[in-house]
Amino acid sequence: MQQKFRMFLYIIRPIGIRVKICDYVNQNTAHSHGIDLSERMVLEMSVITKAGLLALAAVLLLPSAQTTQAAQPEPLIVIVQKRQDAQERTLRVLRDGSVEEAALDTYLAQVVLSEMPASFAPEALKAQAVAARTFACRQTAGGKHENADVCAQSACCQACLTVEDLRARYGDGFEAAWDKALAAVRETQNEVLTYEGALIDAVYFSCSGGSTEDAAAVWGTDVPYLRAVESPGEQDAAKYESRVCVTAETFAETLRALDASVQLSGDPSGWVQSVTRTPGGGVDTLTAGDRSFSGVQLRKAFGLNSTRFTLLYEDGAFSFDVLGYGHRVGMSQYGADAIARLGFDYRTILRFYYRGAELTTLDF
């Protein structure tokens, strides 16, 4: 939301003004400008706060001594500077081998736009902001990176595209997208998720294919607030369904790369002996020949979008029909959007996906 304030400053004696114009979002410094006021003048200024910035626009109204016509406004100064919050927190972000310092709100807005489409419902964006803040605070406390609090890689921490990359992604819609993301961050200011007083591991993913997964089924460690839950309404996700097909020869070679001792002989239609499933409907183990493989192993080996798949052999090829995209643990982003569009708020979304977790406001 844009807030605008108007003020008038009357100058009654000579004075000099020098202004330094800076763009703190892109960390660039422009030029310094000066002007002398040597007679009675009126300086009309508008102060606008938008997208984490404070902008001061000034127009100089010059008196007319030679004519009775009204003086014409002349643009004088535009100042863009970083808004100073009383308790603004920063963190160190590792990006491409270099560490940069970023305001927490700016970093979180970048994460929200990097991880979730700006077209999602506002309450879904707020849920993403809280999850991202919780994840970042937990990573910071954990000391995973020697000289940084977090990194910008989704495979390690959270995706955090630069402002320039986000502009390229959203094009003419960047300003509107940025406003939505920053609003989501600021309307959940300092809120995090905790369980028994400690920050939770607020993991999230794209879409579940109908159900999220127990953490133990994916990572082997039981986490009480990361349980399998039904997550309907995700069918509009681009990667809700997918298929991977491989020849019988490639199927056998891939399994042998996982376990060289696996014995596969005879008709390929009989290679797969059994499949067991997790609480969230994913593949727990698949037994082929005389060996068993985990769903996590198979997902990685065959490049599947998730572990929730069925396997069919037909006409000399194996087909993996896959539902969902991601590890399927924690919050489904498309599920969050579906819940938000039903009229529920971000608090409900977070409590639905992180069972037993509580919203806590940190005192930064």
Feature map (PLM): residue ranges:
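Conserved, single-site charged/polar hotspot
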Residues: 5-364
